[in-house]
Amino acid sequence: MGIPESKKSIFLRSVFELNKNNCHFDYLAAKKDAGVGFMEYTEQINIELASIHYDFLTDFGKKELTFMLAYIHQMMEAKRVSNLGPLASILMIYISPEEVFKILKLLVERSDKIKMRDNLMHLRNKLGWHVATDEDDHAQLISTFIDSYISLKKNGNRRQVLVKFYELQYNFDFFVHQMMNSLLTVVIPIDFAIPVIFNYLIEGQKGIFKSMYGLIKSNKQFIVSLSSKDQLM
């Protein structure tokens, strides 16, 4: 059982693309549509998530992430997923690029599709400078935001990543604490990091969203500086 093939592409879009009106994710409806055996995949993913860092997410965000990973797992088992790029872009809204690669690697290792293995290696090369960071470095939120922003830019949905972060209610207190320990400079230049930090401390959660979005929108060089490891600083 599961989703009829005729509705597969529609369901994928509804699950993995952000709703430009409210970014709403109907977990119960999506789980129902996914089929009777879906809970087995959810249980498997919950075990694997034990090794993944997602400290910024609330319980609601963790539920979304669990569902998406389980659905990807189910699709890969059925050999209906051949392009990991779009999936990686969506997952980077929830977890850092390093963690995205880690979880996709776990999933792909179970696949007998050589094409998918090659695809994963290409993805690793693309995300290479992210993957190279320290495994315990949680201050990846802004780099995740930048990557997601760039991936959605062509579709005119730049603001929706911002809305999604707000809906998930990231733990910004923890995020700022990590930034104060200089971890943010691993991700972006310090002259961009400082204004974001102070904007948050003064105005709170809404302020950091305004600051991040403003920086990205008005500084093309900021985006360019994050496009390669050599240009980070």
Feature roles, as predicted:
Residues M1-M233:
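Helix-rich, well-folded core regions that mediate interactions or catalysis
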